[in-house]
Regions:
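C-terminal beta-rich recognition modules with glycine/proline-rich loops and embedded aromatic residues
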Residues: 12, 211, 289, 351, ...
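Solvent-exposed beta-strand/loop surfaces of large extracellular or lumenal domains
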Residues: 487-512, 531-537
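Low-complexity, Ser/Thr/Pro/Gly-enriched N-terminal "stalk/linker" regions
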Residues: 1-75, 100-120
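Well-ordered alpha-helical scaffold segments within catalytic/enzyme domains
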Residues: 20, 80-93, 142-157, 191-204, ...
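Solvent-exposed loop and edge beta-strand segments that line ligand/cofactor-binding
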Residues: 3, 59-76, 127-140, 173-188, ...
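Catalytic-core region of carbohydrate-active enzymes that cleave or remodel glycosidic bonds
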Residues: 275-299, 322-374, 385
Length: 642
C-alpha cells in the first residue's frame, strides 16, 4: 500500500497533447454548450431531457410535472462537474455565470431537512427513501456531491458544496447500523464516490466513514431489497429483487470473487473499494479489489476495454462470454473501469492498471462520442450489420450510428467529466516522486519537479520528458512502459546518452531516481502493427484476428472495404503497412493496409457444393474509436483468419 499520495492534480497538470487537447477543445467549444441546450430542451429532434426544468419546478420557480427517469437529476450533476473541470482548463466567465445560476436553482430545490431529489420532491414526496433498490436517490446525491466538490476546487465557490454537505448530513442521520437508523444500501452505487469527494475537499472524517459504511454493509443481508419491497408494498420498474447479483448485493465485498451484475454499478463500487483501501491502508479490501480486477480484466473484458456482455441487465455474464454483435459495453462502464484503475494505482503503482486505463481511454470510451461531439453511443459493439443492428430482436440496443441524445442519458455527460479531468489520470504524485501513466503531452508543475512532455502519442512512439528539479533530494520519475511494448524494445536516452533500463523497470514502470536539475529523458516506443488473437475459450473470436498499433484497436468498415466483411480472410503472413490519412474526418490518423483474400460465392444458391472463388486484395483498417462517423455500414474488429 502506498503512503503519501497527493491527489489534487487537476491544477498541476495541463494537457497539451494534440490528441487529447483536441478532445478537450471539442468538449469546451461544442459538447458542453450542446449538452446545456439539451438539458434545457432547446435542441429539436432529440429525446427530451427536462432535467433543468425539474429543478425549477422543485424550487417553485415554475409550474409543471416531473419528466424523465428517476435519476434525471444526475444529468445536471455530471454536466456541472464537467463544467467545473472545463473552467480549470480554460476559464470562461459566461459559462461560469450560467453554472452559478443552475446552482442557485438547485439550492432553492433543496428541502428544509437537507433532502435533494426532484423526482420525489415533485412527484412522490410521501415515498422518500422507501425504494433504495430502484429509485436512485443515493445515486443522484453522489453525483451532485462530486459536482459540488469539483466546482468548489476549481472556482472556490461553496454554495453547491454547502447544499451537498446538508444532504450528506441528512443521509448520515438516516442510514447506518446505529439504533434508530436504517441499515440501507444504494440500489446503484455512486453515493460512496460522492462522499469520498466531499471528504477530499473538506477533510471531514464522517463523510469517509459513511462511504465505508455503504461499502461494508453491502451483502451483509442479501435479502435487504426483498425485505424493503415487502415493507413498502409498491414498485416502480418491477426490478427482480431476487437477482441479488444484479446490484452486487449477493455477498459482502470481501466475499465477491467475480465481476457480476450491472457493469456500471460494479465498477463504481470497485472504485470506492479501491479508494477506501488506499485511505485506510486496508490490505484485505485491496486484495478483494485485486480478485475482482483479475476476473474482470482477464476473463470478462473486451479488447477495446469494454465491459458488460449482455443487454439483459446491462451486465457481466460468465467467463469468456464476449459476443461482438450483441455486446453491451456501455460507455459509462468503460469510464468506471478507468476510475477503478486509477484508484488501484493509488494502492500499488502497477503497470497492469495503467495498461487497462490506456486501453479503455483510447478505444472503448471515446468511441462513445461522434467526432463532432454532437452524437453519442450508449453501447459500443465490436461488430455491426446494417438491417440487423438496431433493428432485429436481440440486436435493437446495438445501434449502427450514434443518436443525438437518450432518454437515459448517463453516458454523454460522463464522457465530458472524464475528458476534462484527464490530467489526474495521466499522472500520480507521491512523497517520493511523480509517475507518468500515459505518455500524453502535458505541462505539469509538481512539488519537487516541473515536467513538460512532448508527444504525438498515440500515433508516434517518440516521447520526451523535460524535467526541472526543485529540490536537492533524490526524487523518482516513474514512466509507465505499456505491456504491448516487447521487453528490450524501448529505446531510452537521458540527456542524449543511451541508457540500458533492464534493471530499472519495476511492475511496468521505468524508475529513474536522481537529483533532477535541467534534464531530458527520451523514450521511443516501437509502434508496430500487431496481430492479436483471443483465447480460444472466447468462442466468438476463435479463428479470428484483430489488429492493434500502440494502444489503438483497429476495425474494418464497409465504407473502406467493398462487399461483405465476413467474406475477407486474413492469412497468417499477410503483409501489413500503415499510412497517415491526409484528408477528411480521419485526417492525421494512422490507417492500416492489410493484404487479405476475398471469397465470393458462385451463383445465387443458399447452399452449394461449389467453393467460393478467392482473390487477393488489400483491406483498410481504421482506429476503432472513429467508426460510425461516415454513415451506416458494416463494421468488424475481429476478422476471419487462416
Amino acid at each position: 500500500m502506498r503512503d503519501g499520495l497527493k491527489e489534487r492534480l487537476l491544477n498541476k497538470v495541463k494537457v497539451t497533447d494534440k490528441f487529447w487537447r483536441g478532445y478537450q477543445e471539442l468538449v469546451m467549444d461544442t459538447v458542453i454548450p450542446y449538452q446545456e441546450k439539451i438539458l434545457n430542451d432547446e435542441i429539436p429532434g432529440v429525446e427530451k431531457s427536462h432535467a433543468l426544468a425539474n429543478f425549477r419546478i422543485a424550487a417553485g420557480l415554475e409550474e409543471g410535472e416531473f419528466y424523465g427517469m428517476v435519476f434525471q437529476d444526475s444529468d445536471v450533476a455530471k454536466w456541472l462537474e464537467g463544467v467545473a473541470y472545463a473552467l480549470e482548463v480554460r476559464p470562461d466567465a459566461e459559462l461560469e455565470e450560467r453554472a452559478d445560476k443552475v446552482i442557485e436553482i438547485i439550492e432553492k430545490a433543496q428541502q428544509d431537512d437537507g433532502y435533494l431529489n426532484t423526482f420525489f420532491t415533485i412527484k412522490e414526496p410521501e415515498h422518500r427513501w422507501q425504494n433504495l433498490q430502484e429509485c436512485h436517490e443515493l445515486y443522484c446525491a453522489g453525483h451532485m456531491m462530486e459536482a459540488a466538490a469539483a466546482y468548489y476546487e476549481v472556482t472556490g465557490k461553496d454554495r453547491l458544496l454547502h447544499v451537498m454537505e446538508r444532504m450528506a448530513e441528512h443521509i448520515g442521520k438516516r442510514f447506518g447500523t446505529e439504533e434508530g437508523k436504517e441499515p440501507g444500501i444504494p440500489g446503484h452505487q455512486e453515493i460512496e464516490l460522492g462522499l469520498l469527494r466531499l471528504y477530499e475537499v473538506t477533510g471531514k472524517e464522517n463523510y469517509k466513514d459513511l462511504a465505508r459504511y455503504f461499502i461494508e454493509q453491502r451483502g451483509k443481508d442479501p435479502d435487504y431489497f426483498v425485505k424493503e419491497r415487502e415493507k413498502r408494498g409498491w414498485v416502480h420498474f418491477d426490478m427482480d429483487v431476487h437477482n441479488r447479483e444484479y446490484n452486487q448485493a449477493h455477498a459482502t465485498v470481501y466475499e465477491q470473487k467475480e465481476a457480476v451484475g450491472h457493469s456500471v454499478r460494479a465498477v463504481y463500487m470497485y472504485t470506492a473499494m479501491a479508494e477506501l483501501a488506499s485511505l485506510y491502508k486496508d490490505e484485505k479490501l485491496y486484495q478483494a479489489c485485486c480478485d475482482l480486477w483479475e476476473n474482470m480484466t482477464q476473463k470478462r473484458m473486451y479488447i477495446t476495454g469494454g465491459i458488460g456482455s449482455t443487454v439483459d441487465g446491462e451486465a457481466f455474464t460468465i467467463d469468456y462470454d464476449l459476443p461482438n454483435d450483441t455486446v453491451y459495453a456501455e460507455t459509462c462502464a468503460s469510464i468506471g473501469l478507468v476510475f477503478f484503475a486509477r484508484k488501484m494505482l493509488d494502492n500499488v503503482m502497477d503497470g497492469r492498471y495503467a495498461d487497462v486505463m490506456e486501453r479503455a481511454l483510447y478505444n472503448g470510451i471515446i468511441s462513445g462520442m461522434q467526432l463532432d461531439g454532437k452524437k453519442f453511443f450508449y453501447v459500443n459493439p465490436l461488430e455491426t450489420e446494417p438491417g440487423v443492428s438496431g433493428k432485429l430482436y436481440g440486436y435493437k440496443h446495438v445501434l449502427p450510428e450514434r443518436p443525438g441524445w437518450y432518454t437515459c442519458a448517463c453516458c454523454p455527460p460522463n464522457v465530458v467529466r472524464l475528458l476534462m479531468s484527464l490530467g489526474k489520470y495521466l499522472w500520480s504524485e507521491t512523497e517520493d516522486g511523480v509517475y507518468s501513466h500515459i505518455p500524453a503531452g502535458t505541462e505539469a508543475h509538481f512539488d519537487k519537479m516541473d515536467v513538460t512532455v512532448e508527444s504525438n502519442y498515440p500515433w508516434d512512439g517518440r516521447v520526451t520528458y523535460h524535467i526541472t528539479g526543485k529540490t536537492e533530494e533524490e526524487t523518482i520519475l516513474g514512466i509507465h512502459i505499456p505491456s504491448w511494448v516487447r521487453p528490450g524494445s524501448v529505446q531510452v536516452r537521458i540527456n542524449g546518452k543511451v541508457k540500458d533500463i533492464t534493471a530499472d523497470v519495476e511492475k511496468g514502470y521505468l524508475i529513474l531516481k536522481r537529483v533532477w536539475e535541467n534534464d531530458e529523458v527520451e523514450l521511443v516506443f516501437p509502434m508496430k502493427i500487431r496481430k492479436i488473437y483471443a483465447n480460444l475459450k472466447v468462442r466468438e473470436d476463435a479463428g479470428c484476428v484483430a489488429f492493434m498499433r500502440g494502444p489503438m484497436v483497429y476495425c474494418f468498415e464497409g465504407v473502406d472495404n467493398p462487399g461483405l466483411l465476413q467474406s475477407y480472410h486474413i492469412f497468417e503472413d499477410a503483409k501489413m503497412e500503415e499510412e497517415v490519412c491526409k484528408e477528411g474526418l480521419l485526417e492525421g490518423s494512422v490507417l492500416l493496409k492489410i493484404k487479405a483474400r476475398k471469397l465470393e460465392t458462385v451463383g445465387d444458391s443458399l447452399y452449394s457444393e461449389v467453393a467460393p472463388v478467392r482473390t487477393l486484395t488489400t483491406l483498410t483498417a481504421v482506429p476503432y474509436y472513429t467508426w460510425g462517423n461516415r454513415g451506416e455500414n458494416q463494421m468488424r474488429v475481429w476478422m476471419r483468419g487462416e
